[in-house]
Amino acid sequence: MKLDNTSKEIILKKSEFLLHNNFKLIEITDSTITFSNKKIAFVIGYERHDNVSNINIKFLQENKMFNLGWIAFVRRNQMPLPQNKLDNILELLDYAEKNHAKVTNLQFCQDSREMVEDFLK
């Protein structure tokens, strides 16, 4: 699914906190918006062939990527996220802004992945 121009504008506005935290807008494609500070990348996007949206956090030097949707889910006591693609992205950006120091910490993300794996067992 493509990001329409209105959604892109809304997402870019909601992502301004990343710019204030020394991230730069790196790329905008039909389905993703990417911010990076050369160590970590936030890849915000819609799945190409599905009605799903998500934000991935990639630790570039370590070459490790984490799904912010799952992190938010397990860290917020399994509170479900909105089903609307744009609302889901905005909710995840809000979570990332409020928990910026945590979600940009590799250990926090790794611990969250373990929580997800335990949840899925």
Task: Set out the residue ranges of the language-model regions.
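Hydrophobic strand positions within the blades of repeat-based beta-sheet folds
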Residues: L18-L19
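Intrinsically disordered, low-complexity regulatory regions enriched in serine/threonine/proline
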Residues: M1-K13, L25-K121
